[in-house]
Amino acid sequence: MTSPTFELVIGEGCDTSVAEGVRSALGAHVPERAVHEVGQADIVVAVGGDGTIMRVARQVLDAGASSRILGVSGGRLGFLAAFEVEELPLYLGAIRAGTLSIENRHALHWRLLRDGQEAATGCAVNDVVLAAGQPFRAIELEGEVDGGAIPRFLGDGLIVATSAGSTAHAASAGGPIVAPGLEATILVPLAAHSLAWRPLVLPAEASVALNVHHANEGSSLVQDGRLAERLQAGDRVEVASHFQTLRFLRHPERPFGATLAAKLGWAAPPSWRRPGDDA
């Protein structure tokens, strides 16, 4: 975001601050605020790609805040971003007035148990993945959903995704796309050693537990596309809906189907050329 655009965003009558390290890049004369204070904001503006927006959303969760999140595309894809930088001036009035609709999205909370003790915890906006990792032999998992056993899994990994995450890694692995407003937790296998192990859509409030029976040296728990913890045989990973709901501001004129088509090429016809067309 350029400094002139930033000045438009803050406008008059807005008590505005920026995260540490951002002020110098913008050349803006506004207070800096520590990341852990993000929950004090009414609206948190995240400018960047999906990774940036997810990181900001996790900070809101960690702060226990109900801040609204305004995602502004500044990366390569920005599927989670409702707005493009250049169109912000058109909607600043509605943003300041608080008249934009809010899209509530559930997130995930996970914890890693090792030797019966809690070894690590975290939260995810899109997904939690138990990945086989190097040297790329299959990972073996035994799972439970709400305390009931599900078939043992053997393969490259297992994705536990939110509805928002259904358009990310889960979609690339053949999982279903879930529209906003339909909250769900989705299990999507990665290269399962069984043709019958298919994606499974669960209620958002379902709790999933995965016991690691076999792991590789590089087996990992991946949170929103980033390494969170290494896994080893005997570990147990519990994933449940986060007690907080994320509140994203919605674009008033861009339905979900249009976003899918524009950013993911959803339902696009195959490319072809007529004989004689230029190469």
State each model region's role:
Residues 130, 146-149, 198-279:
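ATP/nucleoside-binding phosphotransfer catalytic cores, i.e., glycine-rich phosphate-binding loops
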Residues 51-57, 167-172:
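Short glycine/serine/threonine-rich phosphate/pyrophosphate-binding segments
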Residues 104-108, 124-126, 137-141, 156-158, ...:
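A generic structural signal for short beta-strands and their flanking turns/coil linkers
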Residues 77-156:
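Catalytic core of DAGKc-family lipid kinases
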Residues 1-47, 54-62, 85-103, 112-122:
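ATP/NTP phosphate-donor binding region
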Residues 152-196:
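Gly/Ser/Thr-rich active-site loops/lids in small-molecule metabolic enzymes
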Residues 45, 49, 73, 128, ...:
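A residue-level signal for conserved active-site and pocket-lining positions in enzyme catalytic cores
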Residues 64-68:
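A short helix->loop->beta-strand "cap" motif at the edges of active sites that frequently abuts
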